[in-house]
Design a protein with these regions (language model features):
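Electrostatic, structured charged patches in enzyme active sites and in nucleic-acid/phosphate-binding
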Residues: 2-156
Length: 156
């Protein structure tokens, strides 16, 4: 993870989506002609993965993790990224990474409990926690690491 922390310092978040065309398509796990980003943070992370020589392989929404949603239904979670990194020590480590605004990683403010905004934030938080719990389990079973990157990690 040393490598990842070294290079992600200059990201900006904006609501933005499109298709990313990799410079190094051989590094991409999946179809390199159909790489979708759903935010500018994701796009910049794609550029980082594509151009960083320590990242041996990467993918975006290429892994499917089944989970039981708060409504009891079985659903599928597509984490934002999979990366395989050669650490400075030479060790190869695999990560599943979710890129999210910090606000969505924390419980909503209880002071506003009666508002629609609170209910929406509480539902988003509960859904995210359920998905991320399934992702941690998935990673643990496969000797991988699960990370959530927020604006704090991305230097925004």
């Amino acid at each position: 993870m040393d490598t990842l922390n070294t290079y992600v310092g200059s990201f900006i978040f904006m609501a933005y989506s499109g298709y990313y065309k990799p410079i190094h398509p051989q590094k991409y796990r999946g179809n390199p002609t159909n790489i979708v980003y759903r935010s500018l943070w994701e796009r910049k992370f794609m550029v980082f993965c594509d151009n960083n020589p320590s990242i041996l392989q990467w993918g975006s929404e290429e892994i499917i993790i089944p989970y039981r949603a708060p409504d009891g239904k079985i659903r599928r979670y597509y984490p934002d990224f999979y990366i395989k990194v050669r650490e400075k020590s030479g060790k190869v480590t695999k990560y599943i990474i979710e890129v999210k605004p910090k606000k969505q990683t924390q419980p909503p403010n209880v002071k506003n409990k009666k508002t629609a905004k609170y209910r929406n934030e509480a539902l988003t938080y509960a859904k995210n926690q359920t998905k991320w719990s399934a992702a941690r389990e998935y990673c643990e079973d496969r000797q991988m690491n699960f990370l959530i990157l927020t604006e704090d990690h991305l230097g925004v």
